[in-house]
C-alpha cells in the first residue's frame, strides 16, 4: 500500500529539512534527495504498527504580505 504525503523542504545552514505537513514527521539530509529519502523512511517507521488515518485534503499555496 502507498499513500501520498505533502512535504515541505527548507535549507537550514548546511542541511535540508523535510517535514510532512499531514503529521509533522520530519527528517534531514545533506541534499534534498537525502532529506526526502530519510523522511520516507521516518514515515514508514511512524506508520509501521498502525493503519493510516484518513487525512483531510491539504492545499499548499503562497501569499504576498506587505511588510
PLM features: residue spans?
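Short aromatic-glycine-(Arg/Gly/Cys) micro-motifs in beta-strand/loop hairpins
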Residues: 3, 8-20
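Short, charged, surface-exposed hinge/linker loops at domain edges
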Residues: 1-8, 37-67
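Amphipathic, hydrophobic secondary-structure cores in small proteins
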Residues: 15-38, 47
Amino acid at each position: 500500500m502507498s499513500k501520498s504525503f505533502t512535504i515541505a523542504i527548507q535549507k537550514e545552514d548546511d542541511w535540508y529539512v523535510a517535514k510532512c505537513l499531514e503529521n509533522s514527521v520530519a527528517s534531514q539530509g545533506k541534499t534534498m534527495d537525502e532529506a526526502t529519502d530519510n523522511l520516507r523512511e521516518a514515515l514508514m517507521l511512524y506508520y509501521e504498527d498502525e493503519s493510516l488515518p484518513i487525512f483531510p485534503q491539504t492545499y499548499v499555496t503562497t501569499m504576498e504580505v506587505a511588510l
